[in-house]
């Protein structure tokens, strides 16, 4: 039995082909000519998103390692940190990937001078340090209605297909990937009403979700980000909330390390020894 796709492939199509063990699916145009082939032996999925990785920071907390090397190019195991993220996105069928750069930008441009797994990475220079999302205003090659924005110094196995499906299912304007964060208080805590103690909670544990630095955003909303201004993703989240936009969180089920300090860099080095890619 022959399967083929006309136009764009949907998540339902992808799941169907996977359950049937179908690895190759041609896409045909209106004249029946093949213009693409979906290869599920190479890619986990084919997500209709563009991706932008923020790689312009100085990585000051990782000095002296970052004095001559930009943080995204520091190696975890045998690969640069950023390459794990690029290759993961490619495995989900993401073909339009940009990296915004500033500090030691020439090294990153040289690093991506050749395609990775057949995908050309677009390097975009920011003229000044513009925060964790401000430089996206200089990216002008979007093809899809949904844009994934992420920090380039993360070490994670987030499931991008689940992330995107959750975003679409809830018709969100923005989805923020989140990681569980537990705070354990080593003392007894008073339950107070004014000055009076109403009770005692012995060594409580509180569970929260923390911002993981990975976002899915409706492309049209990116125009709200100001030009040539230092602007963080948290500023953008607060703006959308103030406008009563739908901002949701997506819990990451796998591992996640923000490589911002020497301790986290060591954690990633230890973890990668036990992973198989």
Residue ranges with predicted function:
Residues 147-148, 155, 161-168, 181-184, ...:
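Catalytic-core segments of class I nucleotidyltransferases/pyrophosphorylases
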Residues 38-68, 81:
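N-terminal nucleotide-binding beta1-loop-alpha1 segment
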Residues 1-3, 66-69:
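Bateman (tandem CBS) regulatory domains
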Residues 58, 152-154:
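Active-site metal-binding loops of divalent metal-dependent hydrolases
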Residues 3-23, 27-30:
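The conserved cystathionine-beta-synthase
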